[in-house]
């Protein structure tokens, strides 16, 4: 039996199937796969009267419980990508929609599930990890790495420490190694003259498209993702898909996807410079093995391997 299914992802941008990132990309890739087996599947980024008048079998909404008040649906699935504590739910007017609607919750990590308030009266709570979009699947392997390292976390916490260490302990000892910073707006780094950072081989790249990220990831030797406040961290599995190991504290949800074979876990900033030099000096065979392990590990996050859990959850 075919069901009327709606994926709702609230965004001010037009839902362009090719050019999008983050939550939008996840919704659209999952939507396209579900539509292949259930033709009456739709996606929208804004509420309309037409949506409100239609009787839905299932509505899957990303981070927004308020939409359930306006849609007629037999089953309501709230797809959690971010934390929603009680005080935030009140501030965002989401508490009452969660309480009065019978909602099934899907969390993208065990960490997020455990950090979500137990006071919410969800019908069901299930963990389904996020997945790699098509751009990051089945990439050509590059074993000839340059002395490059990347930072792609959009929040700046810890980055100032990394920059200071890079200037004082890394660049001063090896002026060939480079750090590329992606994803951050310039206003997040007001302390620094970004142009002057280049003399220390630190390059601020801003927000770029996926093909540019892949270009740098497949050339680099490591990604710095400390793990502060990450409910899943797509950056990590994207790095793995490019054969790129992680340097991390192993905190929050990042700890669920890091191990000694795909990451260099450090206990504090004091270990960062020695870890960078350790990676630079890896034996060729060790680097090759680590690259292969990262790529193979990333395949568990291919949509084809996550998809069966979604179809069971939707009852397809």
Q: Where are the model-predicted features located?
A:
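A charged, aromatic-enriched C-terminal amphipathic alpha-helix characteristic of glycosyltransferases
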Residues: 22, 270, 288-314
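Nucleotide-activated donor-binding/catalytic signature segment of Leloir-type glycosyltransferases, i.e.
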Residues: 190-211
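Short alpha-helical donor nucleotide-sugar binding micro-motif in glycosyltransferases
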Residues: 215-220
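Aromatic "clamp/platform" in nucleotide-sugar-dependent glycosyltransferases that forms part
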Residues: 228
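Conserved donor-binding/catalytic core segment of Leloir-type glycosyltransferases
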Residues: 140-158, 163-167
């Amino acid at each position: 039996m075919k069901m009327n299914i709606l994926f709702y992802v609230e965004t001010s941008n037009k839902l362009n199937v090719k050019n999008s990132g983050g939550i939008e990309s996840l919704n659209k890739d999952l939507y396209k796969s579900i539509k292949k087996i259930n033709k009456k599947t739709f996606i929208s980024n804004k509420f309309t009267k037409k949506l409100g008048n239609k009787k839905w079998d299932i509505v899957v909404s990303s981070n927004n419980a308020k939409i359930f008040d306006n849609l007629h649906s037999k089953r309501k699935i709230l797809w959690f990508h971010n934390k929603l504590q009680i005080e935030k739910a009140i501030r965002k007017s989401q508490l009452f929609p969660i309480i009065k609607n019978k909602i099934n919750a899907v969390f993208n990590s065990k960490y997020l599930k455990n950090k979500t308030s137990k006071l919410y009266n969800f019908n069901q709570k299930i963990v389904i990890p996020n997945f790699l979009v098509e751009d990051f699947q089945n990439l050509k392997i590059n074993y000839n790495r340059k002395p490059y390292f990347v930072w792609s976390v959009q929040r700046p916490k810890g980055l100032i420490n990394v920059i200071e260490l890079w200037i004082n302990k890394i660049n001063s000892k090896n002026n060939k190694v480079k750090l590329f910073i992606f994803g951050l707006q310039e206003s997040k780094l007001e302390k620094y003259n970004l142009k002057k950072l280049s003399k220390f081989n630190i390059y601020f790249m801003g927000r770029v498209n996926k093909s540019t990220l892949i270009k740098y990831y497949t050339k680099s030797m490591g990604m710095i993702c400390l793990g502060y406040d990450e409910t899943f961290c797509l950056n990590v599995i994207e790095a793995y898909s490019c054969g790129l190991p992680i340097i991390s504290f192993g905190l929050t949800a990042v700890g669920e996807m890091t191990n000694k074979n795909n990451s260099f876990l450090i206990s504090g900033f004091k270990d960062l410079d020695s870890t960078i030099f350790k990676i630079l000096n890896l034996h060729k065979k060790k680097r090759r093995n680590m690259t292969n392990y990262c790529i193979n590990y990333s395949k568990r996050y291919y949509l084809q391997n996550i998809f069966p859990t979604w179809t069971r959850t939707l009852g397809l």
